[in-house]
Curated annotation (Swiss-Prot):
This is Collagen alpha-1(IX) chain. Residues 1-163, 187-325 are annotated as: Disordered. The gene is Col9a1. Residues 237-249 have a biased composition (Basic and acidic residues). Its main location: secreted.
Length: 325
């Protein structure tokens, strides 16, 4: 046999072979490092209104407010019923006897006049002095705690997500998805990253949270601002009948004015009297109402008397009435 010849030149590259069957799935790779913190997600829908929390502890009593302005005077109340009549006063001391007047001239007998009209009612007296103001009443009992108020009005919705915010969220979701796929597949070479997918729909609203514990007691608040003056109050009920006043001390009135001269009596029958005795003094008569003077009457019949007793009889008739006994 001859010697071994030199090796030939390498042949040309043949055509590419057919794609072989897909190999078995490789083992999952190790977990990669934690990525950077992503932007916050889209806020979910507003959850249902939670049940009202437990009532908090009663706070300390606030400082007393400033004294308000004096309210408007109310309407005058209805006129009270007439009080009970007072006890009858003691009889006043009898006044001194007035001086005896001079006998007037004998007038003609007139007809009895009609009673005069009643005079007008006197002017009402001045009102009494207002009494001193009474002491303030005792402080009332503290009222009970009021019922829980109605829930407040729902607040306005939050700001709508912007396009930039949606893009950031979508990029974060896509990156997490590709990171999970890269961890589950074992490939010899890392391929190029695909295009970001479309943003997914927003997730369902989360369940409402549990009721929180009652918070701590707050700090005591500042005193409130002075409020406006109150409105005019309603008309109060009619007051009860007042008690009967005490009996006043007996008083003595001023001395009255001398009464008017009474009407002259009827002329007595003609008689022939002599020096008679003075009769007993009768009880004082009731003062009559002065009537309107009537027209002069007709002249009476001429009297008969002795010349010696005419002077004495004229003086006695001025102090006595009726015929002589």
């Amino acid at each position: 046999p001859g010697q071994l010849g030199n090796s030939g030149k390498p042949g040309q590259q043949g055509p590419p072979g057919e794609v072989g069957p897909r190999g078995p799935r490789g083992l999952p790779g190790s977990r990669g490092p934690v990525g950077p913190e992503g932007s916050p997600g889209i806020p979910g829908k507003l959850g249902p209104l939670g049940s009202p929390g437990l009532p908090g502890l009663p706070g300390p009593p606030g400082l007393p407010g400033m004294k308000g302005d004096r309210g408007v005077f109310g309407e005058p109340g209805p006129k009270g019923e007439q009080g009970a009549s007072g006890e009858e006063g003691e009889a006043g001391v009898r006044g001194d006897l007035g001086d005896m007047g001079q006998p007037g001239p004998k007038g003609s007998v007139g007809n009895p006049g009609e009673p005069g009209l009643r005079g007008p009612e006197g002017i009402r007296g001045l009102p009494g002095v207002e009494g001193p103001r009474g002491p303030p009443g005792p402080r009332g009992v503290q009222g009970e705690q009021g019922a829980t108020g109605l829930p407040g009005i729902q607040g306005p919705p939050g700001r709508a997500p912007t396009d930039q915010h949606i893009k950031q969220v979508c990029m974060r979701v896509v990156q997490e998805h590709f990171a999970e796929m890269a961890a589950s597949l074992k490939r010899p070479d890392t391929g190029a990253s695909g295009l970001p997918g479309r943003p997914g729909p927003p997730g369902p609203p989360g369940p409402p949270g549990e009721n929180g514990f009652p918070g701590q007691m707050g700090i005591r608040g500042l005193p409130g601002i002075k409020g406006p003056p109150g409105a005019l109050g309603l008309r109060g009920p009619k007051g009860d009948l007042g008690e009967k006043g005490e009996r006043g001390p007996p008083g003595r009135g001023p001395k009255g004015l001398p009464g008017a001269i009474g009407l002259p009596g009827d002329p007595g029958p003609a008689s022939y009297g002599k020096n008679g005795r003075d009769g007993e003094q009768g009880p004082p008569g009731v003062a009559g109402i002065p009537g309107v003077p009537g027209p002069p009457g007709p002249p009476g019949p001429p009297g008969f008397c002795e010349p010696a007793s005419c002077t004495l009889q004229a003086g006695q008739r001025a102090f006595s009435k009726g015929p002589d006994k």
